[in-house]
Amino acid sequence: RKTLLTFGLNLSSSVVLTPGDSVGEHLPKSGITFIIGLVVDDIVVIEEHLRIHTKARVLVQFSDIALLYNEFVQAFNNSDGAKHLLFATSLPHWADVDTTSETVRRFHEAVPEVEKWTPLSLLGFATGRLMQRNLQRMDLATSDLLSGLFFNETFITVDDMQYGAYKDAEGVATAEESLSNFGATDISVWSMARALRSDEPVLQDPMSPSMVYTVPNGNALTPAQLDWCGWCRFACADTGSRLTVFLCCIMRNKRDNDNAPKELADPVTLIFTDIESSTAQWATQPELMPDAVATHHSMVRSLIENYDCYEVKTVGDSFMIACKSPFAAVQLAQELQLRFLRLDWGTTVFDEFYREFEERHAEEGDGKYKPPTARLDPEVYRQLWNGLRVRVGIHTGLCDIRYDEVTKGYDYYGQTANTAARTESVGNGGQVLMTCETYHSLSTAERSQFDVTPLGGVPLRGVSEPVEVYQLNAVPGRSFAELRLDRVLDVLDIFGEGTAASTSDYSSTLAELSETAQAIAVSLQSLMGVFTQAQRQGTLMPFCERWRVRCPRKVHPRGTTATVRRLSVALQ
């Protein structure tokens, strides 16, 4: 009742069956019926009812599916009613041989017998992996310490499964008031047809429902009172909208800085992200990119919140993220790649763009470049790549931490920020790179949860010595082109020739410019990105003369780079 009320629905009726009662007598010919605590004999009755009454739907608990899986399979196999039996789960498909889920892959390796691939066995395996991970962190294992670990960490990720948030409620709650989803996230709705065949689509994409419920009480309004209130709310609408605007004005400078690293003596782990070839994508898909980038921003921000990290800033489609925990940072980067892989982008044009770009690069090159993804078998490609590709760089170290009175937030400067940005900028789309400082900041138990490949020493611009870099294999099986070490990296390289320019060139120097200068540079990018080099030079001249910024008269490949950089600083 609480769930239905929260989402604005009503419970038409409820029936408590006694032993010997048949569930079939109470199933309606249409609508949704939720059955709790069914018995084996109910399964055949439900199958027959759903097969005959195509407008009826029956929702059962996942625990019933798991415990009585063989009976459900026997009853619903090859039945039209399978599409109308529904349940919710956060598990990936236990029998998907083409899975992208690391949990299922490990499960299949541990349990090679296909007949043992059931939801209950996968649930047990995932639980075992969770306990294995937690016990590695404990010198002494007791029930209190184990439960405390969940609440202390809030979010826990094992392979590709995330658990949490676990929040220890204040005070003592009665059983009637306590509500829990036991830490499940990314809950999707399946039909029994999908349980039988992994290629069947889910009915509801994964979501993490709110745990804030509207609790009914004895003083609830009657329908007549609600009708009267409906008339009244029109009179209040204008007042409410004005109040909303007023509150927004008050709160617009408010920023949540709770998760921002603030201690100068504590190492900070910085993450930089960037969408590969976003400038060219905007030029070729201007009608699709706004929604795609908005989805990208929303997903990244949800991960920042999930892992208690801090959004420092965004420039274009690049994120700078600060983390108190290197483990949380690496978890965030890994889940980012997995979520983008699983996301339904609603189009294939981004994948087609990357394929065409790689093929064009191969044709125009000297024959040494081999497209890493363009020539993959379509089925293999689908398991490894999907939609926009985001590169990620991670580095850990001490920072110059400053509070900005304008943005009301914290910013991070110095060599740590520069190294993190440079690490991201040499990567490829879909690739996650971390420095040895980040890797060695992880405990042995934490490292065991990630698949990494050492890449050796990598020269980074602005860093005196080559940096040991590790590749996080967030999506096993992906291959990448060589690191982009030949890139000329400066804040305004995006004004250089070529269609592969992207805002990573900004992210690589975020730590070197102020917030205002960055905003000016982004605006100039948007205005001048489609101009030729000569047109840019001519457009910049009046601004430079007005603001007394030195501007070289001769047009050369790097002319506007230095000019616009100086102009951005002068105008801030």
Swiss-Prot record:
- SUPFAM superfamilies, sorted: Nucleotide cyclase (SSF55073)
Query: Keywords, A to Z?
Result: ATP-binding, cAMP biosynthesis, Cell membrane, Glycoprotein, Lyase, Magnesium, Membrane, Metal-binding, Nucleotide-binding, Receptor, Transmembrane, Transmembrane helix
Q: Which cofactor does it need?
A: Mg(2+)
Transmembrane ranges?
A: 226-251
Report the GO terms under cellular component: plasma membrane
Q: What is its EC number?
A: 4.6.1.1
Instruction: State the reactions this protein catalyses.
Output: ATP = 3',5'-cyclic AMP + diphosphate
Q: Which cysteines are joined by disulfide bonds?
A: none
Q: Does the keyword Glycoprotein apply?
A: yes
Q: Which GO terms describe its biological process?
A: cAMP biosynthetic process; intracellular signal transduction
Q: Where in the cell is it found?
A: Cell membrane
* Cross-referenced SMART domains: CYCc
- Tell me the enzyme class: lyase
Could you tell me one molecular function GO term of this UniProt entry? ATP binding
- Annotated Mg(2+) binding lies at D274, D317
User: According to its record, how does it sit in the membrane?
Assistant: Multi-pass membrane protein
Parts of the chain on the Cytoplasmic side: 252-572
The UniProt record lists the Guanylate cyclase domain at 269-424
Q: Which Pfam families match?
A: Guanylate_cyc, Peripla_BP_A-cyclase
The entry's family comment says: Belongs to the adenylyl cyclase class-3 family.
Q: What is this protein called?
A: Receptor-type adenylate cyclase GRESAG 4.2
Organism (species): Trypanosoma brucei brucei
Q: What is the lineage of its organism?
A: Eukaryota, Discoba, Euglenozoa, Kinetoplastea, Metakinetoplastina
**Chain's gene name:** GRESAG 4.2
